[in-house]
Amino acid sequence: MVTLKADEISNIIRERIEQYNREVKIVNTGTVLQVGDGIARIYGLDEVMAGELVEFEEGTIGIALNLESNNVGVVLMGDGLMIQEGSSVKATGKIAQIPVSEAYLGRVINALANPIDGRGKISASESRLIESPAPGIISRRSVYEPLQTGLIAIDSMIPIGRGQRELIIGDRQTGKTAVATDTILNQQGQNVICVYVAIGQKASSVAQVVTSLQERGAMEYTIVVAETADSPATLQYLAPYTGAALAEYFMYREQHTLIIYDDLSKQAQAYRQMSLLLRRPPGREAYPGDVFYLHSRLLERAAKLSSQLGEGSMTALPIVETQSGDVSAYIPTNVISITDGQIFLSADLFNAGIRPAINVGISVSRVGSAAQIKAMKQVAGKLKLELAQFAELEAFAQFSSDLDKATQNQLARGQRLRELLKQSQSAPLTVEEQIMTIYTGTNGYLDGLEIGQVRKFLVQLRTYLKTNKPQFQEIISSTKTLTDEAESVLKEGIQEQLERFLLQEKL
């Protein structure tokens, strides 16, 4: 038997006393009263903040949304299947935030900014709050630089500027995502960081978008935030704010960003589900009273920053799905009133083969020609006017058979202009190509062609001008104006190609 001497015992006790740490930890804890449907009710947690993160015993994280007199309503950021009644919950003292860094470019992440593309961890030294205040009035300046989508119909008649919020609205399967992804593809070489947020989409649809961006080299400057249809409602509700926080990180570093929310109807549905389960009073269409604030605080974060803050910008393209063209439903009207214009995609036009199926009549950009280069303003005015007159005449022509020659000519011109606006998916055009295309149509060069020949001719014309008249593109890109010299080069090129084309067609 080992015997300890008295001085050894006193040494051990002295060491233990020296090692004793007097730190007192006060942990704000509570007990689970009820759990289910992605919601937990907690008793205790007396000093919890609204929106604070709480941690359950088995590791699930939740957000305290309802602070009631005798319990706290928490939404879970996981399935919560292992949470039991009576288990303990502790407040973390933190509001939801995500790590941010340049390393996120080219990655696919979830609403908590964790990678889901199987390519390992993402290193980040900084973090940002998911919900941060939007820039104030003094921090902004008016939108003046164009953000080209590569789609003639949008860039000429519904122009989008850097820092603008433009809603893309339409029924299901009308090409809303296609317009958004084409815009991302067109930012190649424009020094714009793109963030694509997929909310409640099918995983196969998200994979398709990611693949198409990868094939065309667009993932290099793009971040995809995805919460698919099987994700908890809490994460679908948070995904847009995560995307906005990432875009803001780049915006405040003097860069230009484009963020696409696809789509906000699904986010509103996820928020409605959470609110009803938390027993908040339902309003119109069973949405909670603060569903307007849900979207307004998100979209107000898009801005063109002032020169003091570095002139960075964040352009938002929210997408909203309508039911059988009903633009006057609750969520569409809310988002229309928050944004700076809308691009309306029509199922009838889509089915008639007019793609992109943009209804130019009811689409609008509230920034307007401030977001266009001078050369585009010069050619787009005539296009708008002629298409508006054509739409009016077309409706009238259905009732009248004997039309005079001038009316017939105007109808023929309108049909060719409508043909000129058609574009294949994933084939965005540069602004110089758009200007030459519109100029060809509005100045009557297409009037002598059959409608079926228009697109074929325009494709050949673009190739011909690129190889034989490169000075046209050089003048437009350097001066941003359709000068007399550029116009004469363009006229010459169109005439030459038209003669060649008509000869080919005769053979």
Curated annotation (Swiss-Prot):
Source species, domain of life: Eukaryota
Catalysed reactions listed for this entry: ATP + H2O + 4 H(+)(in) = ADP + phosphate + 5 H(+)(out)
Gene Ontology cellular-component terms listed: chloroplast thylakoid membrane; proton-transporting ATP synthase complex
Pfam families named in the record: ATP-synt_ab, ATP-synt_ab_C, ATP-synt_ab_N
SUPFAM superfamilies: C-terminal domain of alpha and beta subunits of F1 ATP synthase, N-terminal domain of alpha and beta subunits of F1 ATP synthase, P-loop containing nucleoside triphosphate hydrolases
EC annotation from Swiss-Prot or TrEMBL: 7.1.2.2
Sorted UniProt keywords: ATP synthesis, ATP-binding, CF(1), Chloroplast, Hydrogen ion transport, Ion transport, Membrane, Nucleotide-binding, Phosphoprotein, Plastid, Thylakoid, Translocase, Transport
Record-stated family: Belongs to the ATPase alpha/beta chains family.
PROSITE patterns: ATPASE_ALPHA_BETA
Source organism of this protein record: Aethionema grandiflorum
Role this protein plays: Produces ATP from ADP in the presence of a proton gradient across the membrane. The alpha chain is a regulatory subunit.
Subunit record text: F-type ATPases have 2 components, CF(1) - the catalytic core - and CF(0) - the membrane proton channel. CF(1) has five subunits: alpha(3), beta(3), gamma(1), delta(1), epsilon(1). CF(0) has four main subunits: a, b, b' and c.
Protein name according to UniProt: ATP synthase subunit alpha, chloroplastic
